[in-house]
Amino acid sequence: MVVVSLETGARVEGKWRPSSDTDTHAALYNAFPTLGGIVHTHSRWATAFAQAGRGIPAMGTTQADYFYGEIPCTRPMTPAEIGGSYERETGNVIIGTFRERRIDPAQVPGALVHSHGPFAWGTGPLDAVHNAVVLEEAAFMDWHALALEPRKGPMQQELLNKHYLRKHGPGAYYGQG
């Protein structure tokens, strides 16, 4: 583990070099102040959706328990973004996607970067890892559901509301927390 300054990216504590994705993380932390941990993976199924340029639709209750809707995929990055401050711009395309689509990052704790892979976040590092695992499982299940029924759309809104809000809404009653 290495502690870095969100303003400068400089190492504050620890013996390791900061991740090459530090600027992506800093952009997300600065734009979304409720984030307490971020995880970036290249997990197989979620990355397949990212490479296809597709979000992960909310097709089932496993996803609905943690993500209040589709896990979005960003637009492709421009040549200028790729050739410039690539890592910072990676964060910016995620931020832009959430702002343009009016998605609350606390309600949808993850995104796919087009042609790249998933980023997930949470209230802390363990929550971010957990959300990354759920994101990958949702991608796995959706891929298989779409293989079985290519015309399958998202789950009905009422079921999404029930599963998400019983854990995260006012008067939440599901679980031990």
Language model segments and positions:
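Glycine-rich flexible loops
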Residues: 1-177
